[in-house]
A protein has these predicted regions:
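Intrinsically disordered, charged low-complexity linkers and terminal tails
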Residues: 1, 124, 159, 177-180
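A polyanion-binding, active-site-adjacent surface
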Residues: 1-136, 140, 144
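Short, flexible loop segments at boundaries between secondary-structure elements
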Residues: 50-58, 142-175
Length: 180
């Protein structure tokens, strides 16, 4: 089990209510990862998801960073789990990334079938993941709840991410809990 898998497994809920499927882990040399507990910079996917779920429009980013372990435990308790479409970092243009993700679809389907139960809601995060996976996963009978791509919350996509992600969660029964 690699470092990414170990960090992710620590926060796997017993029952996954919402399976968030993102693109790929970052380069290991970056020192960044959604489930790494000690992050002082970057971490946009984690920060933006947690703002929507727990902190609203005016979050205390230093509080979030200092309490990442506690926040990840709440994320786990609420039945959220983040997986990547691809097990390894990918680079290139959007077209190249889509191709790489499609090549890994059999592995992703297998992983999702092991994780998702009948009531698990699956959310595809980023245009590349949506374009590469949506149709095939729907054909597989998986419960993908977004019918359009959700912008990755980096490089200017934060507002679109927040709007789409929060509306989707509300539509599918998650009561957003602002804690700070």
């Amino acid at each position: 089990m690699n470092k990414f898998s170990q960090s992710r497994a620590k926060y796997k809920p017993k029952i996954i209510n919402y399976l968030l499927t993102a693109e790929a882990p970052p380069m290991e040399s970056s020192g960044r990862f959604f489930y790494y507990e000690n992050m002082s910079k970057g971490d946009s996917l984690f920060l933006e998801i947690m703002k929507v779920l727990y902190f609203g429009d005016n979050p205390n980013l230093s509080y979030i960073r200092q309490n990442k372990n506690k926040i990840l435990k709440q994320f786990q308790k609420d039945g959220f789990y983040l997986e990547d479409s691809v097990e390894f970092p990918i680079e290139g243009t959007s077209r190249q990334k889509i191709k790489q993700i499609k090549e890994q679809l059999p592995h992703l389907k297998n992983k999702i079938n092991k994780l998702a139960k009948e009531n698990t809601k699956i959310i595809l995060i980023s245009a590349t993941v949506f374009k590469a996976c949506y149709e095939e996963l729907i054909k597989e009978g998986l419960k993908i709840i977004n019918r359009e791509s959700i912008a990755f919350p980096g490089s200017g996509g934060q507002k679109r991410f927040k709007k789409t992600f929060s509306a989707l969660l509300k539509e599918h029964g998650f009561n957003i809990k602002l804690t700070h």
